[in-house]
From Swiss-Prot:
Tissue specificity field: Expressed in head dopaminergic neurons.
Chief location of this protein within or outside the cell: nucleus
The UniProt record lists the keyword Flavoprotein: no
Protein name: Homeobox protein ceh-20
Cellular location(s): Nucleus
Keyword Transcription: yes
The gene coding this protein: ceh-20
Any GO BP: positive regulation of mesodermal cell fate specification
PROSITE patterns: HOMEOBOX_1, HOMEOBOX_2, PBC
Amino acid sequence: MVGTHPANLSELLDAVLKINEQTLDDNDSAKKQELQCHPMRQALFDVLCETKEKTVLTVRNQVDETPEDPQLMRLDNMLVAEGVAGPDKGGSLGSDASGGDQADYRQKLHQIRVLYNEELRKYEEACNEFTQHVRSLLKDQSQVRPIAHKEIERMVYIIQRKFNGIQVQLKQSTCEAVMILRSRFLDARRKRRNFSKQATEVLNEYFYGHLSNPYPSEEAKEDLARQCNITVSQVSNWFGNKRIRYKKNMAKAQEEASMYAAKKNAHVTLGGMAGNPYGMLPGAAAAAGLLNPYNPMNIPGQDTLHMGMPPFDLSVYNPQLMAAAQYQQQMDNADKNS
């Protein structure tokens, strides 16, 4: 039957070969209808079926049995745990992080989450659009050549596996962004985070307001931690470092002390207390306490020996102030003798 109309069959084959050269347009439906109504279409289809059977082409039935990509599974689990994928849990740095750090971290994590979901949506739309186009194309071709439903699904599966590479890249880069974000907030060895300006002001005011004994009690540390929105251990570390810096750079420290003393004077309205922020100490004792807060004579039971260092000799730092203090002491002694 096939050999009785060679001219018609040759014409049909030429039409099929020209399909690859044609573009998709509104005339496709007319061309498809013309091909469907061609008298030799069924003959061509039978020949192609016979050829396919001779080549013994088999379709592997492993589409549904293929396990998920283990790398994708690990990335998905990590994104869910970090609060990027799945329900928004409001990521946390841990119980030891300050409130300011927590808020900043959540804000930046939310930005990563929004960007990730937007890119994932674009990826899924592109993948679905492409696979749907392949399904439609193969379904149309199945009218001319033998294509089983399993073969179409197999081709779609192969395309989806190709798209998985893009998905892995997206999720991998998102996980890296989350890890970099966490390292900025959690790894103090790589980046030291300074306190806020307000917290530093509060701590400095307490330090210079208690220069005679710059060792806050546990209750004072807890109160300062609440005011500064930091931990008690951070308060302890700050005071330890501050005492060391005060000793190493006494001139600058005395300027800071004068600044905070003037600031305190502006808020004090009780008689003689206004002129002396350390009015609890009389005369030269106040000056001596300001010049040397670590003087063991001023702080019973408190000296620098427990820190493994000798007492401070501050006369070398500011001889003018020391001379003024000695002069005041001499005047006080003269008044007592008279």
